[in-house]
Amino acid sequence: MLQNVTPHNKLPGEGNAGLLGLGPEAAAPGKRIRKPSLLYEGFESPTMASVPALQLTPANPPPPEVSNPKKPGRVTNQLQYLHKVVMKALWKHQFAWPFRQPVDAVKLGLPDYHKIIKQPMDMGTIKRRLENNYYWAASECMQDFNTMFTNCYIYNKPTDDIVLMAQTLEKIFLQKVASMPQEEQELVVTIPKNSHKKGAKLAALQGSITSAHQVPAVSSVSHTALYTPPPEIPTTVLNIPHPSVISSPLLKSLHSAGPPLLAVSAAPPAQPLAKKKGVKRKADTTTPTPTAILAPGSPASPPGGLEPKAARLPPVRRESGRPIKPPRKDLPDSQQQHQSSKKGKLSEQLKHCNGILKELLSKKHAAYAWPFYKPVDASALGLHDYHDIIKHPMDLSTVKRKMENRDYRDAQEFAADVRLMFSNCYKYNPPDHDVVAMARKLQDVFEFRYAKMPDEPLEPGPLPVSTALPPGLAKSSSESSSEESSSESSSEEEEEEDEDEEEEEEESESSDSEEERAHRLAELQEQLRAVHEQLAALSQGPISKPKRKREKKEKKKKRKAEKHRGRAGADEDDKGPRAPRPSQPKKSKKAGGGGSSGAATLGPPGFGPSGGGATKLPKKATKTAPPALPAGYDSEEEEESRPMSYDEKRQLSLDINKLPGEKLGRVVHIIQAREPSLRDSNPEEIEIDFETLKPSTLRELERYVLSCLRKKPRKPYTIKKPVGKTKEELALEKKRELEKRLQDVSGQLNSTKKPPKKASEKTETSSAQQVAVSRLSASSSSSDSSSSSSSSSSSDTSDSDSG
């Protein structure tokens, strides 16, 4: 001690000078004590060092206050936005780390920092102030942010890295603030019920709350919870050295309560909240600093009625006055998917729409989709004119609810609602607004997915043939459709059916009956009536464009019919009454099997009066049948109006892409000629959307593309035209053929001798009748033709003469 005191007594002035000479080292008295300088060993006394050190470079000043019971604070929509959106974005940024805590001038060796910067500020302080409801208005918080950035620019050189980092953060700050609600409104905050179960510090609080009259002090927690005195609601006072109950009339006095209350960082004591009876404590779950709950009913509370801190709210981006569950968007969505399956199946297109909706609500797009999750809360956001401008609000939660309730009949209704939501956004907000950019981004996602909408699968229905066929349709539609699919398959079917007829020859000839005879006669008369109808329709109605393939088939059928007729004539000469029957079914089967038309004219059994069995009538029926098919199916208008399946459209798109450049002009011409809405569009930049094109346009495009690519058509409606015959000639030919058949049918009615035998058992349906008739006649014709091959040519000529 003497060594230390002696130099002090001898050289007080030198001691001071020596300390000044230490420079920056002297700024930290602790350092000097631990590492004394050898040069100034005589002046290193603790008493001398302590006084000048405090004068020259004081230690870091206390950090800015984060709570002040004398200063009222509150929760507003703008402050909540600054806390949940702005602060969250800045805090996570890679350049945020220098700004997360106050500047430590001693540690960083910046002795002049606090001389230049009179009001230090950092993001950690701002964050804690937001959590503690320190601010009364958002402008105060924004002022703190600006102070933080300005301090950085004032103290550092413009070229320093820290300045560039601050500029980056400030730019993000200004972008986020641009999306902040324009009008500030105070929020009523509700507290989650189970919040007291979470958090380490809150566990200590739970043990400390006993009753309204027993309030232990908790020294480890620096926040104060204040309650009103009703006995069922406990009152907790933290950091107060004696248990006490603070009633509402005394709340104002707490502002000047002295040192014990200086550390209070909860919501100011005068913040009333809706009274919750029987709830003993509410604790914060989102921040490490628990706040207290102030019960209502305090007449002395400051105006505006403030709530506990905003950190109590779950992290949501849209402000609302009602309790909000944590926004786990995908889980409820998947659960509702299971529920929706019970309500009825969605169509393929609506399933696709549901998938789009799930994607829009997924976390992948949450960064720019969150403003559209819930309906716009105009009152909370301070948008008083919103509902004056937007007459039909829409949001994704409403779309989702409508989808679950099966309110959408088709994909167009779904798309209309989603687009309405985006158009509302564009209508209300200025074009340079952040939310407009978010809407455009989300709409791009929607439109991209919606463009991949699958076609609804066409329900298998009856072919158009059935519309023009007489009521006694006997041939199964499967036979007719298979025939039309390819000419080769039709000829194979004819051969197979002929074989079947021959196999059943003996069985069919074995038993004749009066009943069968009556059935047969009814069939023939029905055929006759059908022939009359077809003849009248052909002569009166407009000539429909015949299809090439069907005309080719007709020619084939005619030639076969002539052969069969010749064969039948020979049979008549040899076998008498039985010969016509074989020839007729064979013809009906050949013509009907190939064109599925012989069946079309058969009527139900027992339709007409009994009479002579008609031997050649089926032959006539077979001849009359082929025109029946063109009458129903040949109309190009009907064919063109047939909608395309998804696969056909996809194939057409691929084929159009294969076309050479010079052929695309014709494609554009076809589209513009048939689509009035596209006539004015620029041919250079026309955009083809197959969903909007008419079926007739698509069919015309398909024909053109196939002709360009020289592909064999997939469908039977594109068939080569017979060379050298006009439409009129073909129609006249048909007419003559029908007249000839009519004469043959009437001749058969007059000269029927013996009816077929077992057809009654096979006439449950009209198609069964036809099969039976054709098989009976075919079998007998085959057997007879073998014995009368020599006379077939003569019978053929006589047949043609009678025609």
UniProtKB/Swiss-Prot annotation:
The keyword GTP-binding does not apply. Residues 634-716 form the NET domain. It comes from the Eukaryota. The modification N-acetylmethionine is found at residue 1. Residues 481-515 have a biased composition (Acidic residues). The modification Phosphoserine is found at residues 37, 298, 301, 635. Residues 316-332, 641-652 have a biased composition (Basic and acidic residues). The modification Phosphothreonine is found at residue 6. A motif (Nuclear localization signal) lies at residues 556-560. This is Bromodomain-containing protein 2. The lineage of its organism: Eukaryota, Metazoa, Chordata, Craniata, Vertebrata. The gene is BRD2.
